[in-house]
C-alpha cells in the first residue's frame, strides 16, 4: 500500500492525455511556452480556469506542480521561518504552535509538522472526513496554525463542511 498514490488502473485512465498535444504551438499559453518553467505563481490560463471554478480572482490563485506534499512542506517551512502574511513573527519564534491532524491520516504529512516541532493534535475522522465539531472547537486556540486536508483517493473529493468552514 502506498498511502494515497494512484494505482495503475487510475494512471491508465489518463494515459490518453499524453498524446493530446502534438504541435509545439499548442504548448504556448498567453505567450509563455509551457514546456519551460512558466510563471512562478502558475500559468495565467490555469489561474483563470481555477478562479472561475473557485469563485475568486485569478491573482488569488497559485498554481503549483503536481506534488501537493512538496507545496505543503514549502508553505509550512516558509511560515516557520518567515511567518504568514498576517503573522506578527515567524512561527519558529512562537512560544507554542499546534497542528490539527485528522487520524487516521497520512504519515508523510504528519512528519512535516513533527519535524518543525508542532504539537500535533489528533482530530477523529468520521465517514465524511474530520469531525468538524472538534475542528471548530480546536481552532479557537490561537496556537493552532493549520489542519492537514487531504483529498480522498481515488475520487479526489473533499467534504464541503471543511472547505467552507
Give the positions of each predicted feature.
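Conserved N-terminal helix/loop that builds the PLP phosphate-binding region
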Residues: 2-30, 140
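Conserved core of the PLP fold type I
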Residues: 26-27, 31-165
Amino acid at each position: 500500500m502506498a498511502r494515497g498514490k494512484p494505482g495503475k488502473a487510475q494512471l491508465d485512465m489518463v494515459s490518453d492525455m499524453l498524446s493530446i498535444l502534438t504541435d509545439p504551438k499548442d504548448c504556448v499559453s498567453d505567450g509563455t511556452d509551457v514546456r519551460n518553467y512558466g510563471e512562478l505563481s502558475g500559468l495565467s490560463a490555469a489561474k483563470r480556469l481555477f478562479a472561475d471554478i473557485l469563485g475568486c480572482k485569478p491573482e488569488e490563485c497559485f498554481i503549483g506542480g503536481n506534488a501537493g506534499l512538496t507545496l505543503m512542506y514549502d508553505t509550512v517551512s516558509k511560515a516557520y521561518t518567515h511567518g504568514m502574511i498576517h503573522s506578527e513573527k515567524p512561527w519558529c519564534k512562537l512560544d507554542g504552535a499546534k497542528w490539527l491532524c485528522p487520524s487516521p491520516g497520512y504519515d508523510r504529512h504528519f512528519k512535516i509538522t513533527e519535524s518543525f516541532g508542532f504539537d500535533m493534535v489528533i482530530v477523529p475522522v468520521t465517514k465524511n472526513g474530520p469531525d468538524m465539531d472538534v475542528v471548530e472547537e480546536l481552532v479557537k486556540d490561537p496556537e493552532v496554525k493549520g489542519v492537514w486536508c487531504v483529498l480522498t483517493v481515488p475520487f479526489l473529493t473533499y467534504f464541503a463542511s471543511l472547505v467552507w468552514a
